[in-house]
């Protein structure tokens, strides 16, 4: 396999962690972009075929919706449907839950199970062991780029997978002492920011930071 075309010809589709979509185009336009066909496209048929895939597997997607108005999970759905539309029977997803909320993860897993039950092969690349145990039937372990082994998920635990990944037993218990200085150092109330396009990148964010602690801020990349 030397190119994405070779993968498509073999029925393999890759969904990358960072999406490759054109924001000003619709879902349907992104899905068919680059495909060979007639000089005049029958968009009515394209929408019909996409909607059949959406209904078949339980996706949340409107083929006519512009990408720039979509949530992150909907953009991911466009990428998945794009691969299905092009005939992929083997789907490889790179860190698919890294940009999703817990509810969106549940929805994604339901769709992936539907595709599995329909006979498609699903490969997920992830570091999240709890999700591996929840979704997969088998799990293959890599360490420093080398294949270590494969287990039936029913026989695996977080501890056993961690040991295979690291190469030694690892304690998963972390004891953190309470900070001595609980003096409030910073207060942020309802901060809102826009980017150069005028779209909100922060909206009504509030938090407090205290001395002697590390405050983690979690969010989607970008």
Where are the predicted features?
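Glycine-rich phosphate-binding loops of nucleotide-dependent enzymes
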Residues: 1-222
